[in-house]
Amino acid sequence: MAFLNIFKQKRGDEASQLSAKGREEISQSIKICKSDDAANEHSCSGDCKTEIEEGEQAFAKLKIEHETPLLNSSKTPKIHFVVPTSQIDWQHDACLEDPKSVQYKISQWCDKNSAKFSNVGTGKTLNCAVSSLPKDIMDIDVMRGTKNNVLILPYFIWLNDLRSDDVEATLDGLVPDLLDENISREKLLETRPNVAVARERAFVFICSHTTRDKRCGITAPYLKKVFDSKLQEHGLYRDNSDYRAEGVKIAFVNHVGGHKFAANVQIYLRNPNTLIWLGRVTPTIVPSIVEHLIVPEEPTLPFPEKVRCIKKYQSW
C-alpha cells in the first residue's frame, strides 16, 4: 500500500539519523531487535487493520518534523507523578488549571524541589502529568479536585487519597524515601498505609493534549485503538473497570514536550523497570511495539531511531 511505502522511506531516513554511538547508548538500557524490518514482522487484521490504514491516512496529512535526530530530545524523569482526571484534553497548562487541585500542588512542589534532588537518584526531572486514567466520580472531594489517587512512576505505586492540603508534607517525606536505594518497596509499604502497588505490567501514555497541539488530538485516538486491539490478542488489555493484575493500561496524558515529533508515546515497563519514550510513532509500528516490547518477558526494542530518551531504573 502507498502509506507503507511512505513509511518505509521515512523510516529509512530516520534510521540513518541514529549513530552507532546512539545505538550503543540505547542498548545499555534495553536490547535492540536484531531485525531491521520489524514493521513487517507483525500486523493486524480486521478492525485493527482498518484502524492502521485510516490512521496512516490521517497521519500523512500532518506536518511532522522528520529531520532532527530524536535521541536525547527529551529528559528522563526521576519521578513521574500521574494524576487521574478522566479527561482527554486540558487547558494549556494542564496541571495549573485549578490552584486548589492535587495536580497543582504536586506541580508546584516539583518546581520548588527539583534542584534539591538534582544529585539524588537516577533520571533528570521531577514531573507531574494529568491523564485520562479514571478518577473516583463518587467522591465529592475528588470531583472538587482537592483529593485524588496519584500514580508514581517508575516505582509502580499508587499514593491513595492524597489531599491537596497534604501534598507538600507527604512528598517531603515520601520522595526522599523513593530516591533512597537502601529503602525497599516492602519497607515503604509497611510504613505508609496509603501507598499501594500498581499491579500492571506496563503503562503506555499517549499525548492527547489538543489544546496545546491539534496534531495530538488527531494522532492519539488512532494509536490507542491499535494498542488496544493488539493487547486484546494477548489478553493484556485492561479497560478502566478491569483491575486484573499483569495487564497493560493505555491512557492519554497532557503535553509531554516536543509536539513537532508527534506522536509521543511513553512506555513504562515494570520488568525490567524501564522507561522508553518514543517520538514520531505511527499506527503502522504499534503492532511491533506491542509484540517486541510489551508482550515478551525479555523485551527488545524495535525502531531504536524513534527513541527520544530511555532509562533503565533500579529494580525494587
UniProtKB/Swiss-Prot annotation:
InterPro entries: Aim32/Apd1-like, Thioredoxin-like_sf. PANTHER family: ACTIN PATCHES DISTAL PROTEIN 1. Keywords: Cytoplasm, Nucleus. The lineage of its organism: Eukaryota, Fungi, Dikarya, Ascomycota, Saccharomycotina. Signal peptide: none annotated. Pfam families: Suc_Fer-like (PF06999). This is Actin patches distal protein 1. One of its GO terms (cellular component) is cytoplasm. Required for normal localization of actin patches. Involved in tolerance to sodium ions and hydrogen peroxide. Its main location: cytoplasm. Induction: Expression is controlled by the transcription factor YRR1.
